[in-house]
């Protein structure tokens, strides 16, 4: 099933069909489909060559896909996991790139959640995950047709997002 976030990408690109997207994304397992879509943009903008993508996929670096699969063999690799990989392994590249200022503001916002202690501990990880997802989509999503809207954030984080007393059921 193609969710609304991926459907919006299909709607914007006349060369992609639902079948071709489904076939390609199903081969990316255990990478979440939206993380797989964003990876193209991430590694094109930050990597100097294919070595960074290769390192992410096949080395045992902290937060790499290989290490993630060893630690969590039945989980999906989500956007917040990709964020953690970038922070730990490509921080210097990010700092020297055109996204440095925006990335720093995302980092500071995430760090401030812990320092201010305004969010109960039981919700802190979910809030951090949502901010990482929003940040990743904000920085890299436009190039691939993703916006940090409610459906995309909910789909990309697997967090049960509630707005006040209302819950959309998505």
Segments from the language model and where they lie:
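C-terminal helical "lid" subdomain and adjoining coupling/linker elements of P-loop NTPases
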Residues: 4-129, 136-152, 156-167
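Short, basic alpha-helical nucleic acid-contact segments in DNA-binding proteins
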Residues: 170
């Amino acid at each position: 099933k193609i969710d609304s976030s991926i459907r919006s990408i299909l709607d914007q690109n006349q060369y992609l069909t639902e079948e071709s997207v489904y076939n390609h994304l199903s081969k990316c397992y255990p990478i979440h489909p939206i993380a797989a879509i964003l990876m193209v943009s991430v590694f094109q903008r930050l990597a100097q060559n294919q070595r960074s993508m290769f390192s992410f996929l096949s080395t045992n670096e902290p937060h790499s896909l290989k290490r993630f699969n060893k630690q969590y063999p039945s989980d999906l690799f989500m956007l917040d996991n990709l964020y953690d990989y970038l922070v730990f392994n490509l921080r210097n590249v990010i700092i020297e790139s055109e996204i440095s200022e925006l990335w720093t503001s995302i980092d500071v916002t995430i760090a401030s959640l812990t320092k201010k202690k305004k969010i109960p501990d039981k919700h802190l990880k979910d809030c951090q995950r949502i901010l990482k997802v929003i940040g990743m989509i904000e920085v890299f999503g436009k190039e691939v047709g993703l916006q940090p809207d409610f459906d995309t954030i909910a789909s990309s984080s697997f967090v049960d997002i509630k707005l006040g007393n209302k819950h959309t059921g998505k």
